[in-house]
Amino acid sequence: MSERWIGKSVKRVEDFRLLTGRGTFIDDHPPVGNVHHAAIVRSRHAHARILGYDVSKALAADGVVAVITGEDVAKETKPFAVGVTTPVHYYCAATDKARFVGEPVAVVVARDRYLAEDAAELVEVAYEPLPAVIDPEKALEPDAPVLHEKAGTNLAGHRRLVYGDPDRAFREAEVVLRERFRFPKYGSTPIETYGIIARWELDGVCTVWSNFMGPFIMHPLTARVLGLAENKLRFIVPPDIGGSFGIKTSIYPYIALIALASKHAGVPVKWIEDRREHLLASSSGTDRIAYREVAAKTDGTVLGMRFKWLDNVGGYIRSPEPGCSFRPTGNFVGPYRFQHLEVDASVVMTNKSLTGPNRGYACGHLYFETEGMMDRLAEKLGLDPVELRRRNLLRPEQFPYRTPTGGYYDSGDYPATLDKAIGIARYDELRREQAKARAAGRWFGIGVALVVDPSVSNMGYVATALDPQFRAKPEYLPKSGAVDSATIKVDPLGRVTAILGTTPQGQGHQTIVAQIVADELGLTPDDVTVVDEMDTFTRVWSISSGTYSSRFGSVGTSAVALAARKLRAKLVDYAAHLMERPVADVEFRDGAVRPRAGKGPSYSVKDLAGRAHWNTESLPEGMEPGLQATAVFGFTVSKAVDAEDRVNSSNTYGFIAEVMAVEVDRQTAAIRILKYVTVHDAGTIINPMIAEGQIYGGALHGLGGALYEELKYDEDGQFLTGTFMDYLVPTASEAPAEIEIAHVVSPSPLTPLGSKGLGESSSMTVPAVIANAVSDALAPLGLRITELPMTPSSLWHLIRDAQKT
């Protein structure tokens, strides 16, 4: 029997080149002839009208070949399409006003970066400063400064979604609780920042090399902005991207800006973002103010919830926002059975930098609130937090489960996953330890969080931002889908190559694909070469292509498996022809096609490759020459949003159960993690070691947002956290000493391998579980954590205020 590779911790093939400095990142890209360099002039004002430019000194500077201003942008490009009907014109640089500190207002192109930076300081921009507003609640007040006069409001979008009968649920409730939450604006600070090389050819073709991660719907949107046909704009993504975590989705405005600079300068233009630029003006998750209500019975049964959100998207709303509000529509109810829900979602523009996907996109916000309310309800009813959740969990026999908001939970055993987590954590023992600690005056707390982990976003969810009347118009084009492709081919010597349309940023696609193909074709992973460089001129791709939303683990691997199976079927047909046997009488086994019964020749993949390539006459009649197969996989459950605002916003849904124990220092308010257990149900695990790495990384991202990270501004909109001295990112020193990881496997019936996504994982649970643990630790003071991050300073002041009262 051939060795099975799926489910094994095969070492990552990517690591050797990365650890030995042989990676090919955007800044390592083979030199493009006569490349010049760009420096971006950015607004120093949070809100100001642009009165004019003087670029004469910059143009006269040594080595400068072009200066592009907002006037050029307004004349030669179109604004980007946005996901709402509010008239917001978002260009790749400021045209009429600057609306946040760091917004691009001009670009200088010079012989090298040093000369470009020097010349950028010579660009003079005349401003009329205007009042700024950074708080989303204040931005909606009648006398607030309006960022976009054509819109006449700072409210970029608003939807009220009603599922079931929430009014009835609250009327019949025996207990109603209300709470206000605040979630911070933070990013994921990938080790590699944005990078672009653009070359505008004389024939009108623009080639762009960049570390863009997708989705490739941004390709046609960018082509439209630049006035190009789609087949005149070529995106190439290098083999290696130094992390992204959603942030590099938002590089596309800079692609348009640097492409325009190349067109003006008549030379290829390269721009590599520095760290201050990245913190100042790349992208981040939204900060949110939320008001939550829960209706329940005294036995703990949750009847319904109400959500009210104000999501702060910064100076403009840009695609894929307002995904911050609607990406988790299908899993709004989390892992719980309640059927009645009201969502009041407002998207607000303020004088902060712009937002977009950040690891766990919108789910960290969602579960911080929901799991906080579940703990409050347990406290109110005198129930253990685990017991309250158990009474409301979906049961295994309910799967596949259709949520009231339209989600289609494909598989799961939530109680078993919870049981495994509390068993590993020795939950009862922790409670006994807590009782002893409290008796000794220590602040010891235990937190629990249960979340549904959505993966593979359905492109149709974004239309939830539009009201049903707008979507019902004849000219409206419904949107749906989640598609990926793969090609597998065998060369004349029998070596196998897999060609992907993905854009990995460290997830280990080459390793995982080699494992899958090896299993399907009876080979070893060493026999398989994987090519994962994206090129829109040569790859099979769709608007949903890319590596984001934890999609590769299900849609990407499914395309690979199906392509390998198509190729295997062709090998079987060919070998049966050579054996002069019916196809039903042969089988593919142990890397070769063999007779099912009796004696006869067998043909290995290498044998068949040699014959097929060198002697096409040997092929059966009607068989196409060549040994290759392409598969395009999409989900049948990926539908457009319906007239009742229901949508299956993702395509596979995992589950995570976490337990954390912490101690809060009575003198410094420092938080020490004593135990952290995380149990995941992500369907079939293809490579446990890679899965563990994703869970560790996700946990640290969540920890950053919970305890340290926030992009902060003063009241005038000036940016306060422009370096890693001010913007605190957790390091190995701040990481938990141990993360205990386990799995429950409920294979997805929707994917060929039974796999689901895993990449965002604990980034969406940690803010909830650690906030609940700290709240539990500080319960003797009557404190509950409702705002993040819990920096030592903010927590210390919170504790001192509580002690005074």
Language-model regions: role of each:
Residues 1-155, 176, 254:
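Flexible, low-hydrophobicity surface segments
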Residues 8, 14-17, 83-84, 153-196, ...:
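Glycine-rich loop/linker segments at domain edges
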Residues 16-17, 121-130, 134, 215, ...:
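Extended active-site and interfacial segments that coordinate phosphate-rich ligands
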Residues 70-71, 227-234, 262-269, 324-455, ...:
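C-terminal catalytic domains of large/alpha subunits in multi-subunit enzymes
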Residues 77-82, 119-122, 189, 210, ...:
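Short acidic, glycine/serine/threonine-rich loops at helix termini
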Residues 111, 267-313, 557-587, 591-592:
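Phosphate/diphosphate-binding loops
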Residues 145-226, 395-493, 720-734, 738-742:
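Helix-loop-helix junctions that connect adjacent transmembrane helices in secondary transporters/permeases
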Residues 234, 239-240, 244-266, 270-272, ...:
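Thiamine diphosphate
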